Amino acid sequence: INFKKANILKLKKLNTSYDVIVSNPPYIELNEKKIMSKNVLGYEPHEAIFVTYDDPLVYYKKIILLAEQMKTNKSKVYFEINPKFCDDLKKHFLTTSFNDVEVQCDIFGKERMIKATNE
């Protein structure tokens, strides 16, 4: 197991191939802050929660780009996702070699996790 700590948006490439990439990037838009629970807002760093770019999928797209460059024969990418962007993220995956896409719901029935495999 290798862990990589980096500013993903500044990273140009990964130095090794990966079988599995797991990420929980920022995916909450700032306008959703008012509906967030206080226990999340009080204990999580805001830069870990809120995406402040025009494209809310910016982190996902960059990770997928890097994964494309460094994949193995059966690489998998796992993300926690914002349900409102699930369809857009699935469509983006289908434009890559990670075209076997599964979505899992959380305990409340919301689309929350996505797995993509390059099989």
Spans of features found by a protein language model:
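S-adenosylmethionine
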Residues: 1-118
